């Protein structure tokens, strides 16, 4: 089987947590995870409404930690600046964290695996919507 690399965004982990889909569906992918996604998931643990929600979110955060973390380095920051420049020129606004996740994918030459439409308008970003 040919394995394809992809960067799973925060929505994918939230979808797994909410059991909207089975993670085995993505057996053909080698997942990476942005440090931005890790931060968003950790924030979810810290801001959970109660102990049950916190435990569920912690489990999701720990799942995400099992995948290759992709950090923000000079290549990612360059990709981010170019991406945001193009978006601003087109008068498009996207969530700031999503722009960093997209830049991470672009810098590493991999697609983003997502449930969101936030990446649809982003130039040069390969998106796999689930």
Curated annotation (Swiss-Prot):
InterPro entries, per the entry: PIN-like_dom_sf, PIN_dom, Type_II_TA_system_RNase, VapC_family
Cell location: Secreted
Signal peptide: none
GO MF term list: magnesium ion binding; RNA binding; RNA endonuclease activity; toxin sequestering activity
Coiled-coil region(s): none
Cofactor names: Mg(2+)
Pfam families the record matches: PIN
Annotated keywords: Hydrolase, Magnesium, Metal-binding, Nuclease, RNA-binding, Secreted, Toxin-antitoxin system
Gene Ontology BP, a term: symbiont-mediated perturbation of host process
Superkingdom: Bacteria
Entry binding sites for Mg(2+): 9, 98
Domain spans labelled PINc: 7-130
Result, substituting residue 116 to A: Does not inhibit growth, forms complex with VapB4
Documented effect of changing residue 40 to A: Does not inhibit growth, forms complex with VapB4
Family under the similarity heading: Belongs to the PINc/VapC protein family.
Function: Toxic component of a type II toxin-antitoxin (TA) system. Probably exerts its toxic effect by binding to mRNA, inhibiting translation. Binds to, recognizes and cleaves ssRNA at ACGC and AC(A/U)GC sequences, usually between the G and C; cleavage is not very efficient, nor is cleavage required to inhibit protein synthesis. Upon expression in situ, in M.smegmatis or E.coli inhibits cell growth and colony formation; in at least E.coli also causes increased levels of cellular RNA. Its toxic effect is neutralized by coexpression with cognate antitoxin VapB4.
Assembly notes: Interacts with cognate antitoxin VapB4.
Stored PANTHER family: RIBONUCLEASE VAPC2 (PTHR33653:SF1)
Name of the protein this chain belongs to: Ribonuclease VapC4
Organism: Mycobacterium tuberculosis (strain ATCC 25618 / H37Rv)
Gene: vapC4
């Amino acid at each position: 089987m040919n394995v394809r690399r992809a960067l799973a965004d925060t929505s994918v982990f939230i979808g797994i947590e909410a059991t909207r889909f089975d993670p085995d569906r993505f057996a053909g992918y080698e997942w990476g995870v942005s440090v931005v996604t890790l931060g968003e998931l950790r924030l979810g643990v810290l801001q959970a409404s109660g102990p049950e929600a916190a435990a569920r979110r912690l489990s999701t955060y720990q799942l995400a930690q099992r995948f290759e973390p992709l950090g923000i380095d000079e290549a990612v920051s360059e990709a981010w600046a170019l991406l945001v420049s193009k978006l601003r020129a087109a008068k498009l606004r996207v969530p700031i964290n999503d722009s960093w996740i997209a830049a991470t994918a672009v810098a590493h030459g991999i697609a983003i695996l997502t449930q969101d439409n936030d990446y649809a308008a982003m130039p040069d970003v390969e998106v796999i919507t689930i």
